[in-house]
């Protein structure tokens, strides 16, 4: 029994390493000062802040918990910043779930968040086909799908 639990834990850890390669965790002290200052101005009461950096160092993101317990993130680039408001699965908009189910029947929604860039709000959906068995699950054919706030489909991008 111990061997099975150890094997399951190793498999889960290896999957975490595989999926975490696109963004790298960084210390706040390694983030450009202007991004930290902007973050502190925008999210004064943020809790559990974790910073990540994109693989090519072009973007930094602070993921945090708001005072009311919601998961949020602010992503900074040289050109702009965007705020992400993550939505719990139980609150996914029905129209978006229906569109994804009809246009991508083999895909499962893995994440939905509202993206705010300079006051323009959109829903961002990440959907993937899952393959594997039991604990050994792998995402395939990942799609980033954008919707207007009225749930109208804007675009679909295949994730690399």
Regions found by a protein language model. Give the residues of each.
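Bacterial Sec-dependent N-terminal signal peptides
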Residues: 1-26
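Interaction-mediating elements
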Residues: 21-160
């Amino acid at each position: 029994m111990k061997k099975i639990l150890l094997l399951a834990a190793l498999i889960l850890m290896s999957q975490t390493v595989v999926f975490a390669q696109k963004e790298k965790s960084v210390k706040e002290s390694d983030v450009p000062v202007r991004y930290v200052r902007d973050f502190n101005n925008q999210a004064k009461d943020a809790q559990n802040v974790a910073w990540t950096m994109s693989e090519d160092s072009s973007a930094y993101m602070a993921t945090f918990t708001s005072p009311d317990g919601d998961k949020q993130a602010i992503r900074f680039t040289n050109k702009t910043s965007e705020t992400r408001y993550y939505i719990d699965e139980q609150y996914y908009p029905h129209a978006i779930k229906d569109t994804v189910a009809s246009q991508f029947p083999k895909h499962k929604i893995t994440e939905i968040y509202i993206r705010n860039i300079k006051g323009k709000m959109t829903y961002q959906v990440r959907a993937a086909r899952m393959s594997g068995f039991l604990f050994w699950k792998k995402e395939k054919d990942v799609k980033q799908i954008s919707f207007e706030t009225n749930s109208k489909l804007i675009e679909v991008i295949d994730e690399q």
